[in-house]
């Protein structure tokens, strides 16, 4: 009698780690989790620490922490001082030299929150790729999430990289984000930028599509239950449809004359509109980072300057932008010691 003994292939440390990372647990870790969880934890933790304890006195001349009397809407982790340029502001770098207090005073917490936040978002997108591959579905969730990542990178990284320093990026707070919106309007006339227009159309269009789709599905649910609550009429394992696409198609055909007849095309369109808008707005931010102008109607400005009776909404907005610049620059960039003569400053409602 012959006995055949098969050799058991030895498993290396990589295989053991791979099995552990992909083990079925309540919160999936995966290889992407090695990037996502530490970066997300450090970014969120840095933001809570910064808004609670860290002042912006040395970078912006402002109070920005709960410790100084700010509330949730006015607290922020502010950008580094303009003099820091585009330094990474590492804790052990030449600016702080390992001094944590000094590092916070220079604005290093903003770099910490922003860079870890960027890698955390990338880790979240990779997580969607990884799980999609493991459960054998398409990776369109990850593709869709590239839109928010593009906006994050363009606003918090690309824009200040195109300017003189990190100082001109948005600080991490509610009121500070509003200040940034006013700043980019006054200095870049962003609302007249076609890429910003596409971004607005994409986001609001996506919200409209979402509302219409949800309402239409609710309108055309099959009566699978006698309960007042229609949710109980659905089972996640049921094979049949839960609403009538035919009825929905007929409804919108009567409303508009046209309607989606293909569920796959309908849902792709709902994906395409907001993601394209996000990417377009990201491209627009890269453009203004390089101080590119869009839609300067110089002929109207010249005519308005020559003819006091000629004015358009465009020329009015240009004057408003000049007012924003004149008022914001001395307040926002106090280190520049801007002094404007009285005759160029806006006066009341006259501008």
From Swiss-Prot:
PANTHER family named among the record's database cross-references: PHOTOSYSTEM II D2 PROTEIN (PTHR33149:SF12), PHOTOSYSTEM II PROTEIN D1 (PTHR33149)
Entry EC number(s): 1.10.3.9
Organism, scientific name: Acaryochloris marina (strain MBIC 11017)
General function of this protein: Photosystem II (PSII) is a light-driven water:plastoquinone oxidoreductase that uses light energy to abstract electrons from H(2)O, generating O(2) and a proton gradient subsequently used for ATP formation. It consists of a core antenna complex that captures photons, and an electron transfer chain that converts photonic excitation into a charge separation. The D1/D2 (PsbA/PsbD) reaction center heterodimer binds P680, the primary electron donor of PSII as well as several subsequent electron acceptors. D2 is needed for assembly of a stable PSII complex.
Protein name, per record: Photosystem II D2 protein 2
Subcellular location: Cellular thylakoid membrane
Domain of life: Bacteria
Catalytic activity: 2 a plastoquinone + 4 hnu + 2 H2O = 2 a plastoquinol + O2
The family this protein is said to belong to: Belongs to the reaction center PufL/M/PsbA/D family.
Upper classification of the organism: Bacteria, Bacillati, Cyanobacteriota, Cyanophyceae, Acaryochloridales
Keyword vocabulary terms for this entry: Chlorophyll, Chromophore, Electron transport, Iron, Magnesium, Membrane, Metal-binding, Oxidoreductase, Photosynthesis, Photosystem II, Thylakoid, Transmembrane, Transmembrane helix, Transport
């Amino acid at each position: 009698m012959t006995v055949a003994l098969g050799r058991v292939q030895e498993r290396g440390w990589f295989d053991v780690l791979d099995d552990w990372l992909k083990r079925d647990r309540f919160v999936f870790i995966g290889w992407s989790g090695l990037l996502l969880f530490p970066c997300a934890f450090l970014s969120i933790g840095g933001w809570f620490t910064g808004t609670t304890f860290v002042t912006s006195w040395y970078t912006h001349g402002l109070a920005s922490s709960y410790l100084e009397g700010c509330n949730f809407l006015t607290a922020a982790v502010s950008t580094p001082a303009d003099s820091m340029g585009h330094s990474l502001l590492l804790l052990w770098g030449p600016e702080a030299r390992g001094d944590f207090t000094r590092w916070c005073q220079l604005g290093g917490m903003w770099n910490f929150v922003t860079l870890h936040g960027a890698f955390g978002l990338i880790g979240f997108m990779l997580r969607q790729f990884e799980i999609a591959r493991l459960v054998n579905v398409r990776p369109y969730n990850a593709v869709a999430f590239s839109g928010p990542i593009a906006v994050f990178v363009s606003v918090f990284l690309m824009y200040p990289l195109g300017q003189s320093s990190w100082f001109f990026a948005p600080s991490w707070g509610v009121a500070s984000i509003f200040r940034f919106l006013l700043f980019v309007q006054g200095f870049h006339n962003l609302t007249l930028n076609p890429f910003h227009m596409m971004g607005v159309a994409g986001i609001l269009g996506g919200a409209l599509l979402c509302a219409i789709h949800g309402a239409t599905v609710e309108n055309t649910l099959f009566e699978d239950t006698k309960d007042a609550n229609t949710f109980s009429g659905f089972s996640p394992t049921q094979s049949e449809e839960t609403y009538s696409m035919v009825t929905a198609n007929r409804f919108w055909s009567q409303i508009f004359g046209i309607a989606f007849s293909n569920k796959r095309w309908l849902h792709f369109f709902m994906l395409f509109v907001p993601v394209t808008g996000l990417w377009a707005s990201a491209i627009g931010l890269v453009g203004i980072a390089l101080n590119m102008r869009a839609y300067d109607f110089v002929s109207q400005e010249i005519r308005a300057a020559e003819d006091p009776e000629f004015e358009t909404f465009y020329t009015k907005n240009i004057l408003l932008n000049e007012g924003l610049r004149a008022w914001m620059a001395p307040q926002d960039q106090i280190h520049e010691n801007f002094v404007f003569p009285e005759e160029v400053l806006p006066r009341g409602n006259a501008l």
